[in-house]
Amino acid sequence: MSIDFPLGDDLAGYIAEAIAADPSFKGTLEDAEEARRLVDALIALRKHCQLSQVEVAKRMGVRQPTVSGFEKEPSDPKLSTLQRYARALDARLRLVLEVPTLREVPTWHRLSSYRGSARDHQVRVGADKEILMQTNWARHISVRQVEVA
């Protein structure tokens, strides 16, 4: 049995055309690849821990076919499923929020009304990361600095 792609066997060409037709498709594809990498990492950890799918299923409170299906085709795994699977391996799942616009460089703000030298009235607002870390929600997530091209 074979599956015909719209462009034959040229999957890379098909993906390139799909991205050209709908730029949001690239983000969807990247999200799916990231989910697959995460599931692959969980599978590798399960094997490293020498646990069977049956043992993981018992720890998760599901049946083995559920674990098998999750490992084979995680089309869009729920966060709670990923967390339960990780806990079944005595691991903890951590999410990292990447914000490409954050920079480590300090941000400076000049006061709009001043007398005398402007140098005396520059106020350091703080690096974006410092400001983020001062907010309450920042304690609950990790922020990774990403360079913007």
Curated annotation (Swiss-Prot):
Induction: Induced by hypoxia and probably by the DNA damaging agent mitomycin C. Part of the Rv1954A-higB1-higA1-Rv1957 operon, as well as the higB1 higA1-Rv1957 operon, which is probably the mitomycin-induced operon; the former but not latter operon is autorepressed by HigA1. Induced in persister cells in response to D-cycloserine. Residues 53-72 bind DNA. CDD domains: HTH_XRE (cd00093). Residues 42-96 form the HTH cro/C1-type domain. Disruption phenotype: A triple higB1-higA1-Rv1957 disruption mutant has no visible phenotype. A single deletion in this gene cannot be made, suggesting that it has antitoxin activity. Gene3D superfamilies: lambda repressor-like DNA-binding domains. Coiled coil: none annotated. GO terms for molecular function: DNA binding; toxin sequestering activity. One of its GO terms (biological process) is positive regulation of growth. InterPro entries: Cro/C1-type_HTH (IPR001387), Lambda_DNA-bd_dom_sf (IPR010982). Transmembrane segments: none annotated. Keywords: DNA-binding, Repressor, Toxin-antitoxin system, Transcription, Transcription regulation. Interacts with SecB-like chaperone Rv1957. Antitoxin component of an atypical, type II toxin-antitoxin chaperone (TAC) system. Upon expression in M.smegmatis neutralizes the effect of cognate toxin HigB1. Neutralization of HigB1 toxin in E.coli or M.marinum also requires SecB-like chaperone Rv1957, making this the first toxin-antitoxin chaperone (TAC) system. Antitoxin aggregation and degradation are prevented by the chaperone. This is Antitoxin HigA1.
